[in-house]
């Protein structure tokens, strides 16, 4: 069911293309920013194997998404390889989001044998001191590097994720250098979102909107260098930055102020993946130029649009609840009571998010709203309203009015 926004902009077919599944809350680390508020042991409310396999059946019947198995720490589940292999055999592209510390040579082989296409490993600093302070356990940095090397030795596609906060923001260039030296296929950065444990450290650790904007411009510059796939994840503003920078480049080159064409914001490349709650994955097609996923930041068809929560992305909790994304704690449905297809097609939360005409404040009147949408999770964290304006955007829209909204489509609950 396609929705239409208040400006007459169709939000595409809204197929579920990226599904992030928190298969357990159990984890061996104590990350101070943890979205999941993970526990030392697997939760008794983690879905049992039979029900988990049934959810995979529902997903495969409803769509053909990339399925990211995350946590907590997904390797805490004794049946994780059974789930990965089952999903792979159902035709789903499976990725694994792990902290890397449990990836021995044997585990790395089991990951590959289960059909996992890419593994993401989080590095929240360029050295052990910085990373381990964020992850809460001494030795986590060295163990993560060991796990990464074990995966690379088998030819596995590996992605590094970095959560940006005050304690490590200055190390971003060093983390990029480290990712390149380790042979990582991708580096994804995330701005800290105040959810879960992140609420307690937000005031101390979140960078300012101005610093955030500076980082996105730095990221654009680095994306032109090639050699590694780069994505600013949970950073919808990046699409505006790219548009503005490309326009400035055209003007500087004497091309004139011709408007840079917008990519179709509803398009999601079939092998590209963005964020989960806390761990992002991207699968890059073979033969695509290195650096920016589609060769140049102006060619964003593989990058899709900004915030994808509820439009092409959703998140499944360890108990089976469905959310727009892992950072937006607003329940759209419950797989213990409803089928996935029904939730995806009929959730009122999802339909509200698919209609950019519902956006409020400066997001509602911004010329980039269909491209960016603002981070709905940060809006919710700041105001309790996931349709309010993005609090970490420095851009001032050219207009100051809001666009009219259209009625909710029939059949939406």
Regions found by a protein language model. Name each.
Residues 1, 42, 47, 113-114, ...:
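Radical SAM enzyme [4Fe-4S]-AdoMet core and its adjacent flexible, acidic
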Residues 1-118:
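Conserved alpha-helical substructure of the radical SAM core
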Residues 36, 153, 375-377:
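Regular, well-ordered alpha-helical segments
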Residues 39, 72, 100, 124, ...:
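Flexible loop residues that form catalytic
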Residues 54, 58-71, 354, 390-413:
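Short Fe-S-cluster ligation motifs
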Residues 235-399:
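Accessory C-terminal segments flanking Radical SAM cores
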């Amino acid at each position: 069911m396609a929705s239409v926004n208040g400006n007459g902009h169709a939000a595409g077919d809204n197929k579920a293309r990226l599904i992030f599944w928190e298969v357990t809350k159990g984890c061996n680390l104590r990350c101070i920013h943890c979205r999941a508020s993970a526990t030392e042991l697997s939760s008794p409310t983690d879905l049992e194997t039979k029900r988990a396999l049934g959810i995979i059946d529902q997903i495969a019947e409803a769509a053909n998404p990339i399925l990211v198995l995350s946590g907590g720490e997904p390797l805490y589940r004794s049946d994780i390889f059974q789930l990965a292999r089952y999903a792979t055999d159902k035709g789903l592209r499976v990725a694994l989001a792990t902290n890397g510390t449990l990836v021995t040579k044997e585990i790395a082989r089991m990951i590959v044998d289960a059909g996992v296409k890419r593994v993401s490993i989080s590095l929240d600093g360029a050295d052990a001191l910085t990373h381990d302070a964020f992850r809460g356990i001494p030795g986590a940095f060295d163990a993560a590097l060991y796990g990464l090397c074990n995966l690379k030795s088998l030819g596995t596609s590996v992605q590094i994720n970095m959560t940006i906060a005050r304690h490590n923001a200055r190390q971003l260039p060093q983390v990029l250098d480290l990712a390149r030296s380790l042979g990582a296929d991708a580096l994804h950065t995330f701005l800290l979102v105040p959810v879960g444990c992140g609420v307690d450290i937000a005031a101390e650790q979140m960078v300012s909107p101005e610093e955030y904007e500076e980082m996105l411009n730095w990221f654009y510059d680095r994306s032109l260098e090639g050699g590694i796939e780069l994505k600013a994840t949970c950073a919808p503003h990046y699409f505006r930055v790219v548009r503005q920078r490309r326009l400035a480049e055209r003007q500087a080159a004497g091309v004139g102020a011709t408007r840079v064409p917008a990519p179709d914001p509803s398009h999601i490349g079939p092998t590209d993946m963005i964020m989960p709650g806390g761990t992002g994955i991207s699968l890059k097609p073979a033969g695509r130029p290195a650096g920016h996923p589609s060769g140049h930041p102006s060619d964003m068809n593989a990058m899709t649009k900004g915030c994808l929560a509820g439009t092409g992305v959703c998140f499944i909790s360890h108990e089976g609840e469905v959310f727009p994304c892992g950072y937006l704690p607003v329940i759209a449905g419950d797989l213990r009571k409803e089928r996935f297809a029904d939730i995806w097609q009929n959730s009122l939360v999802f339909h509200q998010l698919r209609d950019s005409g519902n956006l409020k404040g400066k997001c509602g009147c911004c010329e980039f709203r269909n491209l960016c949408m603002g981070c709905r999770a940060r809006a919710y964290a700041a105001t309790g309203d996931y349709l309010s304006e993005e609090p970490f955007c420095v851009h001032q829209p050219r207009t100051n009015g809001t666009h009219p909204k259209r009625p909710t489509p029939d059949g939406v609950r």
